UniProtKB/Swiss-Prot annotation:
InterPro entries: D-Glu_cyclase, Putative_hydro-lyase, UPF0317
Protein name per its UniProtKB record: Putative hydro-lyase Bphyt_4813
Major enzyme class: lyase
Known EC number: 4.2.1.-
Keywords associated with the record: Lyase
One Pfam family linked to the record: D-Glu_cyclase
Domain of life: Bacteria
Length: 259
């Protein structure tokens, strides 16, 4: 069944839908979330600015406001995402479906572009996406590549992976390069060990997918990178989306193209 972004958010809010959001509302941008106390917001904004491949900002909320009008007219961040991770002192403490009981007046929402946003363009060009075929979450991996630090925020880059034949990988570079607001072109193609990934069958987030003998692993910078930064910062309290469980926005993907 197809939904408008508003309808999809209502389905999530009412608990009629849950799980990863890849493949839904393909014409509209999806967003990663980082929700932090106001005292850390300036440093985190600088972190995003210094790491634009992994942390391209789509919108920022006002302190204490769960609405981000730039992302959607009827949006309620507290309930419009399928699942959230709650971090305490840099450790993931719990997973929740709603932020109603955790919301505070000092929390600032950062919405960060997601590679799910360009997947519909890839599919329209006939490029198969294995995680959608297998109906699982996209695999995501921690790398050894360091982020540019800002204040307390640092950590290592996280990447998502999609296996493709060489010709499809070339076309994927051409297509995704037009969308820097949702991570843009891949950051690595081929040997995962070169970026510190030991085993593609054991992702740090999401689910493993089949990589066939005639395919290359293609890696994009991932909006889970802020969660690595939150871990390294060891903030007393922070919130993020559960990887793969995104906020669907009202932003048409076509408006994010730069070419």
């Amino acid at each position: 069944m197809s939904y408008t972004p508003s309808e999809f958010r209502q389905q999530i809010r009412s608990r009629r839908l849950s799980g990863p959001t890849a493949g839904y509302c393909g014409d509209y941008a999806q967003a990663n979330l980082a929700i932090l106390p106001k005292q850390h917001a300036d440093d985190f904004l600088r972190f995003c600015t210094l790491n634009p491949k992994a942390c391209p900002l789509l919108g920022i909320g006002e302190p204490g406001d769960w609405r981000v009008p730039a992302l959607g007219a009827d949006l309620d961040i507290r309930n419009d995402v399928p699942a959230f991770y709650v971090y305490r002192h840099g450790e993931r403490a719990e997973e929740v479906r709603s932020l109603d009981e955790l919301w505070r007046d000092d929390l600032v929402v950062f919405a960060i572009g997601c590679s799910f946003s360009f997947e519909e363009m890839l599919r329209r060009e006939g490029i198969a996406l294995r995680h959608i075929e297998q109906q699982v979450n996209v695999p995501m991996y921690r790398t050894r590549e360091r982020n540019v630090a800002a204040g307390v925020f640092g950590g290592n880059r996280v990447v998502s992976m999609r296996p493709m034949k060489a010709a499809d990988a070339i076309r994927a570079i051409q297509i995704t390069s037009r969308f820097p607001a949702v991570h843009g072109a891949p950051v690595h193609i081929g040997d995962p060990s070169l970026i510190g990934i030991r085993d593609l069958a054991s992702p740090d987030f999401g689910d493993a997918v089949e990589v066939r003998s005639d395919e290359l692993p293609v890696f994009w910078a991932c909006g889970v990178t802020p969660q690595a930064a939150i871990e390294s910062a060891r903030l007393p309290f922070a919130i993020a989306h559960k990887p793969g469980h995104m906020l669907v926005t009202d932003i048409p993907n076509t408006t994010l193209a730069v070419l």
